[in-house]
Structures are given as structure tokens and as C-alpha cells.
Amino acid sequence: MLLIPAIDLKDGHCVRLKQGDMDQSTIFSEDPAAMARNWVDKGARRLHLVDLNGAFAGKPKNEAAIKRILAEVGSEIDVQLGGGIRDLDTIERYLDAGLRYVIIGTAAVKNPGFLQDACTAFGGHIIVGLDAKDGRVATDGWSKLTGHEVVDLAKKFQDYGVESIIYTDIGRDGMLSGINIQATVKLAQALTIPVIASGGLSNMADIDALCAVEDEGVQGVICGRSIYSGDLDFEAAQERADELNG
């Protein structure tokens, strides 16, 4: 089970938002590369970066900070990035800089042809991030709810050749209310590619619950607010996950 620390970037800083609200952000570090080093030193095997400004602007906005993170830890662990990735040139630039995976969210839903092209050009490097509320997919930094069912869309993207799906329950993100295990497992069971859980991880009980469903296709979990607030000790959580699932 991969426990994947999130580094959310806003104006070059590492922050956390409350339910995707750019006006409700808490700065946790003004040096994201040092934060990346911190998580790697505590046993992280992958990092999850989000360009928050980019997600809202539709183009990269924190590229300098991202490249500093890649220079610091990119040769040691896999790094994945989402937010503002809307064209193949951006993907190529980030992969050349040392990124392992690019996460396509809104653009995959709105422009499936772009996702197909990305999977063809950069097979093995494309992850789709699906954000959902009550089983329906949301786009544009969670501001718009679509009519798409998560499972149906994920199956289509699986056929395109995406590497995995990051599933975020946006009713829970940043609220420390527990991962929506049921919805995550339902999605994982419908697919043959891995699912990474996101949104609401709060304590060791969540780690235990996720490890219990790893065999259903749940590969890992994004760790956000809980590891920054101290509600969850990342190092201890990763050790527990390794003990449970080896």
C-alpha cells in the first residue's frame, strides 16, 4: 500500500485547502522542496504534487517550485503531478524534468481526445484524477458537477491505456472525515487498473481499512491534511501499512 504525501502548491508555497476553496488555504511551508525531502526521509515512496494555481488557470503556474522538488527528490522516488495540464507539450516538458506520472483531471473529462493522444504519446506515464460527489464526476477545480458516472468514465479511460485512477471523494477532502472506502472499492472492482484513494484520510483506522481492500485493486492513498495537522503520523502509518500488507 502506497501512502503518498500531497504537496499542494499555491503561489510557490506548500498549502492545504479546505474542500478546494482557494480562499481557505493554510500555508505549511514556504519551501516545498524541503517539504518533499521531509516526506522522502520519512519513508515516502511516491509524492503527489498539485499545482493549485494551475488547476484554476488551466495552465502551469508553479513550474519553478515543481522543478525544485524534482531536482531534490526526483531521482530517488516517483513523483506525480496534477493541475493545469492541458496539452502534450506541458506533459513532455514535465516528464523531461524528471516527473514520473502526469495526472489529467478536468481535461480528460472535457476533451477525451486529448487523453487518448497523451496515452498514445506517453504510455505508462498518464494517470487520470476523477473527483466525484455522490458518484458523479466534478470538473474545474470541483466547481462544476457533470452528469458522468464515475465508474462509466473510468472504464472508458482504462480502455485508452491510462496507468491508474486517482479517486477523490470531494465531500470529504480536507475534512478529516475518513476515506469513502465503499465508493473507492466499488470503482476498483469495476476496473483492471489500480485505483488510488484520496479525500478524507484521517487516522490509523483508515490505513487499516485501506490495507484490507488492497487486493480489490486499491493501490495507495493520497495523504493530505492529516499528515500536516499531526492527526496522522506518516512514518508510523507507512510502517503499519507495510506490516499489514508486506
Curated annotation (Swiss-Prot):
GO molecular function: 1-(5-phosphoribosyl)-5-[(5-phosphoribosylamino)methylideneamino]imidazole-4-carboxamide isomerase activity
An example Gene Ontology CC term for this record: cytoplasm
Catalytic activity: 1-(5-phospho-beta-D-ribosyl)-5-[(5-phospho-beta-D-ribosylamino)methylideneamino]imidazole-4-carboxamide = 5-[(5-phospho-1-deoxy-D-ribulos-1-ylimino)methylamino]-1-(5-phospho-beta-D-ribosyl)imidazole-4-carboxamide
EC number: 5.3.1.16
Transmembrane regions listed in the UniProt entry: none
GO biological process assignments: L-histidine biosynthetic process; L-tryptophan biosynthetic process
Gene3D superfamilies: Aldolase class I
Alphabetical keyword list: Amino-acid biosynthesis, Cytoplasm, Histidine biosynthesis, Isomerase
Family matches, as SUPFAM superfamilies: Ribulose-phoshate binding barrel
EC supergroup of this enzyme: isomerase
Amino-acid biosynthesis found in the keyword field: yes
Annotated Pfam families: His_biosynth (PF00977)
HAMAP family xrefs: HisA
Similarity comment: Belongs to the HisA/HisF family.
Name recorded for this polypeptide: 1-(5-phosphoribosyl)-5-[(5-phosphoribosylamino)methylideneamino] imidazole-4-carboxamide isomerase
Organism: Polaromonas naphthalenivorans (strain CJ2)
